[in-house]
Structures are given as structure tokens and as C-alpha cells.
Amino acid sequence: TAAQLALLPLVDLEKEPLFVAIDAKTGSSGAGIQPRLTTHHPLRANDFRAYKPLEHQHLPEIEQMWNQRGGSSLTNISFVSQMAPLVRGIFVSTHVFFSEPPSEDQLEKCFRRHMPNLPLYD
């Protein structure tokens, strides 16, 4: 969801990105209720590692959201999630490259239109 929230406003630009790179860090609470050696918080408290870097289960959802709402297709996308030494939270950085970069004003309008009352993008 965090990656989709970052990308959704950019659909309004009606431009197909050349490349999208999504870098996500997730806490141990997102790994589910069953403790495992790689996901249980006490065992990963001082660890930081990539999680399914080339075949993440949320990548199709991100592509589907963009394709359904934008009319264009995401053909060149990289999604890497890391398990961070956090209990809760997801931190996402999204890098979107266009052949002609949008102006700062265009970007602000897109994001404000989608999230007018939330300080999410401030």
C-alpha cells in the first residue's frame, strides 16, 4: 500500500515512466503472527536484509494499480523490500524517471489532488 500511495498521484501526469525503482523497508510486525528464524523480531533486531528482491509478492499489485488507473503500463520497474530492525512501520522511497521530467508545480498539483488534507507528502 505504501508504494501504491507514492505512485498513485503520478498517474495524473499521463506519462509513461521510463523506469520506477521502489525501495521499501519493513518492520517485523509485517511478517505475520508466526515467528520464523528470519522474521521473528528478537532474532532480526540487529539485522538488515533484502526480502524477495527479484520476485516480491506485492509487485503485481503495484503494476495492476498503475495500469488500471493510468492507461499506460509499467514495463520497467524494480521493487526491493528490506527487513529492517524495526517493530512496526513501512518506509518507502520511490524513484520515478520520465523522458521529460514533470515540473515541480505539476508534481505538487498531482499529490495535493490525491491527498489534500494529509501531511503525508510534506
Say what each PLM segment does.
Residues L18-D122:
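C-terminal substrate-binding/catalytic lobe of Rossmann-fold NAD(P)-dependent oxidoreductases
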